Structure formats: C-alpha cells, structure tokens
Regions:
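Short, charged low-complexity linear segments at domain edges
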Residues: 1-18
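Canonical Radical SAM [4Fe-4S] cluster-binding loop centered on the CxxxCxxC motif
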Residues: 15-51
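Core AdoMet radical
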Residues: 36-51, 65-79, 98-113, 124, ...
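Charged helix-capping and loop-helix junction motifs
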Residues: 49-54, 82-89, 115-121
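A short, well-ordered alpha-helical element
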Residues: 53-62
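Alpha-helix C-cap/termination motif
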Residues: 62-63, 95
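P-loop/Walker A phosphate-binding loop and immediately adjacent motor/lid segment at beta-alpha junctions
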Residues: 80-93, 140-167
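Catalytic-core regions built around general acid/base machinery
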Residues: 88-95, 122-126
Length: 167
C-alpha cells in the first residue's frame, strides 16, 4: 500500500500561486543534498487511503478560494507510488478541470518515455507542468524557478505537447 508524507493546504513555494501540495512518501533516487530526505523511506509517512484524496479536494477550494495542486515527494512516479499518484491526480482533475497541476519527479522525461505504462501516460496527459530530473548538488541554484538544480527542466503541456520553459 502506498504512503504519503504530508498535505500542505496553503503552499506558496511549491507551484504556481497558492497550492495544495501533496508529498508522496518513498523515493528511489536518494539525491545527495535533497531538501526532503525524510520522504525517502517507502515505509515512512502515513498510509494512503481514499479519504486522503477527498481531504485534498476539499482543501483546494477551502474558504471559497480555489488553489492549484502540486505533487512532490518522495518520488510520485516511483512504481510503488504510481497508482496512488494517478488516483489523486485523476480525482483532482475531475473535481477542478481548470486548475494547474504541477508534478516534480527525479526521473528525466526521456527516462519516463523510454518504457511508459498506461498509468504513467495517464498522469502525463492530465498534469499541466512537469518538473523533471534529479537534484544534482553540484548544479544547485536556488534562484531557479521551481527547481533546485540547473539540470532540472520545467515542461509545460500545451496542445498535448511538452515544451521546456526553464526561464
């Protein structure tokens, strides 16, 4: 069963504008210098259940303010987390078709596309922004938008095509 680390209902750091951020638990990358090392252990955090997605859906429109949605980790696209990540993203997109959904992954886009399964393709066809690539400490640059190191890319989905928009 998948696990998650945290839900932050009013996050202004991770994403576009005010977001609800969902941190999945478990990461195979173990990037040196990672800001979120406590999310590496696949057995840590909290057990995911269907009530979690409803908590997120309610938080997105709490106090009549619609927020965007961010999915971070841990590694949302790790095989152990893929079904949970899709379940949450699918529910959020159906409830809020016009919000921006951003997902961070330590996998590069080319790694993801080398052998994608249906669940991964569903996720990539539903989110709006993909921040891809592992954090590399020697490439660290805290002035970058949405990224921690220069090797990472911001990809925006437009007309079912991904465009790099690193600036």
């Amino acid at each position: 069963m998948s696990r998650y680390s945290a839900i932050i209902p009013n996050d202004v750091v991770n994403g576009d504008g005010v977001c609800v951020s969902f941190f999945v638990q478990g990461c195979p990358h173990h990037c040196p210098g990672c800001f979120n090392e406590e999310t590496w252990d696949f057995h840590g955090g909290e057990l995911y259940g269907p009530d979690v997605k409803w908590t997120i859906i309610k938080a997105i429109s709490a106090n009549n303010i619609t927020r965007n949605f961010s999915v971070l980790g841990g590694e949302p696209l790790a095989p152990q987390n893929l079904d949970m990540t899709w379940e949450v993203i699918d529910a959020v997109r159906h409830a809020y078709p016009n919000i921006t959904i951003t997902l961070w992954t330590g996998y590069t886009y080319s790694m993801l596309m080398a052998n994608p399964n249906e669940t991964l393709l569903n996720i990539l066809n539903t989110i709006d922004i993909l921040v891809d690539g592992p954090f590399i400490e020697s490439e660290k640059d805290l002035s970058l938008k949405l990224r921690g190191s220069r090797n990472q890319h911001i990809r925006v989905r437009r007309d079912n095509q991904w465009e790099i928009q690193d600036d």
